[in-house]
UniProtKB/Swiss-Prot annotation:
Keywords: DNA-binding, Metal-binding, Nucleus, Repeat, Transcription, Transcription regulation, Zinc, Zinc-finger. PANTHER family: KRUEPPEL-LIKE TRANSCRIPTION FACTOR (PTHR23235), ZINC FINGER PROTEIN 384 (PTHR23235:SF142). GO terms for molecular function: DNA-binding transcription factor activity, RNA polymerase II-specific; RNA polymerase II transcription regulatory region sequence-specific DNA binding; zinc ion binding. It is found in: Nucleus. Pfam families: zf-C2H2. One of its GO terms (biological process) is regulation of transcription by RNA polymerase II. This is Zinc finger protein 696. SUPFAM superfamilies: beta-beta-alpha zinc fingers (SSF57667). Residues 32-46 have a biased composition (Polar residues). One of its GO terms (cellular component) is nucleus. Gene3D superfamilies: Classic Zinc Finger. May be involved in transcriptional regulation. The keyword Transcription regulation applies.
């Protein structure tokens, strides 16, 4: 004991406690706010106070100790995926130069200043090809396979390869017929969750994809893309026989039947056959007399929606079909085509008796009376 002072042991203990408290405060100031691992590490830094007499080096080796819970969620997941479910072996600590039972907090590619809390925090694993960053090294490794083209996961049934193992699992449902995602409204089941989400919009009426030109909304992104072609005039699908192009692939399939003479849809009433099911439905209204499309202005009803659209233009005065030669406009497309023959000289209606051709069908009908045909 020093004269007139505290006992030497008590003074040394007090000084040590003050030093540890300062270390704790400094460490917490450097750690992210609310960090659980920082609080645990700081708490552990006070533990050597009870072992003040322990030789240097038997406690924590240089700097704040690693917290037991500091292994991140991604690393824990990686550990579970390794054989035996154990973390990687000891690695060299970048902070101390020695070995640690856990990986360093600073990733190998973090760059200068990473230990001081640089911009790597949160997503410390960047892709060298595109710069995108990831929270987990395993996610970064999976992403890099997109650039390398590597597809290590292969379907055992058909041999198709995939980038991610989860993609193989989804693909194999096509072979097994498994459909684990069922709609709670109607019970329809799907092999993939995103197909169920798309289907549910049928029940909810949700239409998140709106056309930027006219505002019309759609429940499916693909339907919105198809609709956009009506504004752009883009026709991606061409007929291999004649080169005629169409907005939709289904239109090409129907068109090809005109080349092959295929008419798979037959009327049960009269036996007339059609290349398209929609044409058969329209034809059947001739027998039933059904006219489901009524004009809201005058009440007149029509068997086809296209007839109603053309009729509505009588009330609105709309004439959307304009001649490029003389500028004359027409309500109906049929009138526009008839007018075009004035400029082109086309005469598609030919008499089978004498070979004379006409521009309009009713002119041919009138001419045939010359030959005595009704």
């Amino acid at each position: 004991m020093e004269p007139g002072g505290e006992p030497t042991g008590a003074k040394e203990s007090s000084t040590l406690m003050e030093s540890l408290a300062a270390v704790k405060a400094a460490f917490l100031a450097q750690a992210p706010s609310g960090s659980r691992s920082a609080e645990v590490q700081a708490a552990q830094s006070t533990e050597p106070a009870a072992e003040a007499g322990a030789p240097e080096g038997e406690g924590h080796r240089g700097g704040p100790p690693r917290a037991l819970g500091s292994l991140g969620l991604c690393e824990n997941q990686e550990a579970r995926e390794r054989p035996g479910g154990s973390p990687r072996g000891p690695v060299t600590s970048e902070k101390t130069g020695g070995q640690s039972g856990l990986e360093s907090d600073v990733p190998p590619n973090a760059g200068p200043g990473a230990e001081g809390g640089g911009s790597w925090k949160g997503r410390p694993f960047p892709c060298g090809a595109c710069g995108r960053s990831f929270k987990c090294s395993s996610d970064a490794a999976k992403h890099r396979s997109i650039h390398s083209g590597e597809k290590p996961y292969e379907c055992s049934d058909c041999g198709k390869a995939f980038i991610h193992s989860s993609h193989v699992v989804r693909h194999q449902r096509a072979h097994s017929g498994e459909r684990p995602y069922a709609c709670a409204e109607c019970g329809k089941a799907f092999g993939q969750s995103f197909n169920l989400l798309r289907h549910q919009r049928v029940h909810t009426g949700e239409k998140p994809y709106a056309c930027a030109d006219c505002g019309k909304a759609f429940g499916q992104r693909s339907d919105a893309a198809k609709h956009r072609r009506t504004h752009t005039g883009e026709r991606l699908y061409a007929c291999g026989e004649c080169g005629k192009r169409f907005l939709h692939s289904s239109n090409v399939v129907r068109h090809r039947r005109t080349h092959h003479g295929e008419n798979p849809y037959e009327c049960r009433e009269c036996g007339q056959a059609f290349s398209q099911s929609s044409n058969l439905l329209q034809h059947q209204r001739v027998h039933t007399g059904e006219r489901p499309f009524a004009c809201q202005d005058c009440g007149r009803a029509f068997s086809r929606s296209s007839f109603l659209r053309e009729h509505r233009r009588i009330h609105t005065g709309e004439k959307p079909h304009q001649c490029g030669h003389c500028g004359r406009a027409f309500r109906a497309l049929s009138g526009f085509f008839r007018h075009q023959r004035l400029h082109t000289g086309e005469k598609p209606f030919r008499c089978t008796e004498c070979g004379r051709a006409f521009r309009l069908s009713f002119h041919l009908i009138q001419h045939r009376r010359v030959h005595g045909a009704e």
